[in-house]
Amino acid sequence: MSLYEEIDYKKLERLEVKHSWIVEPIYKASTYVKSMPFYDWIENLNDIQDFRDAGCQLYYHSDTFPKVMGLMLALTPLEETLMMPFYAKHAYGEADHSKMLLDWMIKHNLVKDYQEVRDVIITKETNACVNYAYQMAIEQDREKWLVGLNSGIERCSNDFFKAIAPKMHKLGAGDEYFDVHVEADEHHSIIGLDYIEQYEADSTRGKILIAKALEGIELWASMIHSWIGISTYPKFNLKGEIIKDIKC
């Protein structure tokens, strides 16, 4: 039985309309990310052994995020107690995913054991993306957390797994780890907006939240490209439009 509730697409549509002030920039920016070189790399992936380096970085991300979610839960102030089931369910749903990934990597001889993954040097871009979530957990701003992690990062994650899951099946290496994230991340993305206020896009608070969501998307894009040896740092304006893509 799935941990995640069946997606209510009518509710999703209502939230997209109600919060178009932030949904539109998120969608526009995340769509741009899908046009970047990393997705060409996935499309051209013909041997799962070529996924090893990316897989080891992904393991760190997959292993760390539930801990960040646990921190968000643990630091929840009394006045935010009603959010605890939401945070707890998200953390619990992600808790065993890194083990699933490790088992898959060992099964397909990408690594021989856990220590081999531990010995990998994590890219600064991967650390930056994870630390973005840690910073929000410490800050305990519910709206920033929901637009940044649940709506921005999770949407990009959903796009990633929608691309990589069928590719792995095509290569004869499909696995529940990849498949479950298509369901899980789609469940989390945008639905969290049910717990934030409605703002005008040009209001001070609206601009702060849009900027926080786009910051996460920028960090995500830099992170996944670092997994394949590309240094790129996209920058979006508050409409979600690309204004700069620095490649080093």
What does each model-identified segment do?
Residues 2-248:
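Non-heme di-metal
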